From Swiss-Prot:
GO terms for molecular function: rRNA binding; structural constituent of ribosome. HAMAP family: Ribosomal_uS8_B. Part of the 30S ribosomal subunit. Contacts proteins S5 and S12. InterPro entries: Ribosomal_uS8 (IPR000630), Ribosomal_uS8_sf (IPR035987). Pfam families: Ribosomal_S8. One of the primary rRNA binding proteins, it binds directly to 16S rRNA central domain where it helps coordinate assembly of the platform of the 30S subunit. This is Small ribosomal subunit protein uS8. One of its GO terms (biological process) is translation. The lineage of its organism: Bacteria, Bacillati, Actinomycetota, Actinomycetes, Kitasatosporales.
């Protein structure tokens, strides 16, 4: 059976692995998931990511980041725009996550950007997720 929302599946796997203190989490690979992983690494939520060959297709493996006493670097993840209800934001009305402490991942005409990057470029788009 096909997956309806692969981005929500990625975020759920990441949330579950983070709450269970796993060091890595694997999932089926796609380009958009790789771009989301790149943003999470740039913002310091994960230590790294890699694409591995699997028996069928490829797997994306994320290395989770924890503090010195195993504090989680990801406090929360929320999927915003869903297949049943798309959420868009104009460049003048981009969301702020926790007053700027978190990150909104936005799909724009310039690719996937954070809310801060989209504001600097002056573009809006589909608000995929919040991470804080």
């Amino acid at each position: 059976m096909t997956m309806t929302d692969p981005i929500a599946d990625m975020l759920t796997r990441l949330r579950n692995a983070n709450s269970a203190y796993h060091d890595t989490v694997g999932m089926p690979h796609s380009k958009i998931k790789s771009h989301i992983a790149e943003i999470l690494q740039q913002e310091g939520f994960i230590t790294g990511w890699k694409v591995e060959d699997a028996e069928v297709g490829k797997n994306l493996v994320l290395e989770l980041k924890f503090g010195p006493n195993r504090e989680r670097s990801i406090a929360g993840i929320k999927r915003i725009s869903k297949p049943g209800l798309r959420v868009y934001a104009k460049s003048t009305n981009l969301p702020k996550v926790l007053g700027g402490l978190g990150v909104a991942i936005i799909s724009t005409s310039h690719g996937l950007l954070t809310d801060k990057q989209a504001g600097k470029k002056g573009v809006g788009g589909e608000v995929l997720a919040y991470v804080w």
